[in-house]
Amino acid sequence: MMTTKRTAIRRRLAVGRAPNGPPWRGRKRGHEAIVAPLAATLAATAAVGLGVVLARAGRDRRAARAQLARVRQFAMLPGEGLATGLERIGLGQLDLAIEMLATEDGQTLSESAVHEARKALKRLRALIRLLEDELGGQVFARENAVLREAGRRLSAARDAEVIVATLEDLMRRHPGELAHRRGVVRLHAALRAERERVVQQSLADGSTAADALDELRGVRRRAMAWSLSDRPGIEAVEPALKRLYGRGRRRYRRAALGSGSRTLALHAWRKRVKELRYAAEMLDRADLDDRDGARASRTPHGLTPVRAGGKLVRRGRKRRRKQARRRREALYIRRVARRADELGELLGAEHDLAVLAGRVRSQADPAGAPVAGRGTRRALLRLIAKRRRRLRRQALREGKRLYRRGPKRFAARVRSASAAASRG
């Protein structure tokens, strides 16, 4: 009897310990059976928590980028006054230039960073020229000189890049006349070698960027003390805007008459055109939709078909036409900016060709060795002159459209457009 009971107990224990026996039959939960589900739960909770943290971090980064882009928007924001907007634009462009030029110890600047910094400096010079009356002549002269010198420090690499790109563009336009000439190939190779040398030297020279950076930080500190009057509309900058436009108009007339050096006249005109472009971009409203001016209606004559009482009636003619006129008027500043941008591109291409022509005439690489024979030089200069004549004709035609008004009428039109944009 005792043996039978012991045998039965052993059998039950064996069933409880059997790995393939019925689940938990005759046994209690072990340590592993408790820890494993708990560990899985904790791991899942940690993964969810980490996912939430990463999602929040990504959202915060996107929000920060959006806020930074908004602060650095080179235009008036919705509901923003002129003084507030120009102060934001000035500080935003200064911060952008400083950020592009600031590097860690031992690091070199990138070409794209230098390019963005130079663009910001050009915009800043246009801004303080627009604020000349507000800042005063002494402050304007000081800051303009500082910004001009900072831009000059960064210009060597860009100038070397432009002359290579100009020759390559000419080669693409006239492959049949230039591709087979060894002198053109040698000139191209010499200019590319010079570009690489200048770019590497400029980017590796930390003192150049450091000096420009110190100057810009000084401007940034002084800019915090600028006091701009919050007068309605564009009243605060209207005198400067008329002067800026008038200078460009006079330069256009000199270039059209062809008196003196045509190359110098066109280059001086180009500077005034770029100032006008940046001024118009700053005064433009970022929230305006380019399509608004064309949305008079989807039916002829700006009428809206409305079915009422079983008949087709047309309503809203005057209201819709008035809205369309106001939208077109509000977009006038943007049209000026775009025309000035296109004109500046034409004048810039003409000037780049003039620089290339000077290099071709010198018939030597930077080391003084001749790179092109007489026939190659004649062919290049002939094609350059032909291209320059075409660009000049286009530029003068566009300039006539852009500068057809007098300074007073132009400023009045900008004032009206700014008011229309503010009304929405």
Where in this protein do the model-derived segments appear?
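Function-determining surface determinants
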Residues: T3-R295, V306-G424
